[in-house]
Swiss-Prot record:
GO terms for biological process: regulation of transcription by RNA polymerase II. Its main location: nucleus. It comes from Aedes aegypti (Yellowfever mosquito). This is Cyclin-C. Belongs to the cyclin family. Cyclin C subfamily. InterPro entries: Cyclin-like_dom (IPR013763), Cyclin-like_sf (IPR036915), Cyclin/Ssn8 (IPR043198), Cyclin_C_2 (IPR031658), Cyclin_N (IPR006671). The gene is CycC. Residues 48-151 form the Cyclin N-terminal domain.
Length: 265
């Protein structure tokens, strides 16, 4: 994506302070523990990923949709909009912004119905309840809350540059790319610039693959303390995954703060 990250709205408005993030969540954490809250977001990141794959979207589009989703709830309670409505809305908006091409409304709704029924029936007993008018209305609300800051810089491009600098390492690239996908289940996209996320994921991949690149990392002009924080956040989500049980998701969704039903017209 063209443009300079440092002059972008992503850098200037959407690299958030961790304390602000924690404070904004307090309303939801009256109903949920921190771990339960994180598991709900892992679940919806999975929903966005599967919807995106079914719609044959590029990973960049799926990642942007996930960041929109996380940004919305960084400033709003889960009770503001049902996450099951916001997830496909984020996909619709991301596909436009990333110039993937238009997803027809009917195809989006049909895909949501199929995915919820076939892949996530453990969480939802009912069929997907929303229609095109709900998604279009939700899109206006999402745009307003994102303050129309729609360009999202992802760690994939910095990763390709880093790998090129190291020397073509296919195995390292593949694993780090997957770790960047995993990082979407954490808060790092809200807290750190994408190049730091790429380096944090690369560092984990080097440990897993037993690649000795300490000297190369030492030459990087980067705040290694921040990189370590990113690596810890990703390793923490792996720990959380160990206790992530599909059977408990329905109970967590029932416990989650809910939007008030709209008044009958």
């Amino acid at each position: 994506m063209a443009g300079n990250f440092w002059q972008s709205s992503h850098h200037q408005q959407w690299i958030l302070d961790k304390q602000d993030l924690i404070r904004e969540r307090q309303h939801d954490l009256k109903n949920l523990t921190e771990e339960e809250y994180q598991k709900i977001f892992m679940f919806f990141a999975n929903v966005i990923q599967v919807l995106g794959e079914q719609l044959k979207l590029r990973q960049q589009v799926i990642a942007t949709a996930t960041v929109y989703f996380k940004r919305f709830y960084a400033r709003n309670s889960l009770k503001c909009i049902d996450p099951l409505l916001l997830a496909p809305t984020c996909i619709l908006l991301a596909s436009k912004v990333e110039e993937f091409g238009v997803i027809s409304n009917s195809r989006l709704i049909t895909t949501c119905q199929t995915v919820i029924k076939n892949k996530f029936s453990y969480a939802y007993q009912q069929e997907f309840p929303y229609r095109t008018n709900h998604i279009l209305e939700c899109e206006f609300y999402l745009l307003e809350n994102l303050d129309c800051c729609l360009i999202v810089y992802q760690p994939y491009r910095p990763l390709l540059q880093l790998i090129q600098d190291i020397g073509q390492e296919d195995q390292l690239l593949t694993l780090t790319w997957r770790l960047i996908n995993d990082s979407l289940r954490t808060d790092v996209s809200l807290l750190y610039p994408p190049y730091q996320i790429a380096i944090g994921c690369l560092q984990i991949a080097c440990v897993i693959l037993q690649k000795e690149l300490k000297a190369w990392f030492a030459e990087l002009n980067v705040d290694m303390e921040k990189v370590q924080e990113i690596a810890r956040a990703i390793l923490n989500v792996f720990e959380l995954w160990k206790s992530y049980d599909e059977k408990e998701i329905q109970g967590l969704l029932e416990k989650m703060p809910k939007p008030k039903p709209a008044p009958q017209r």
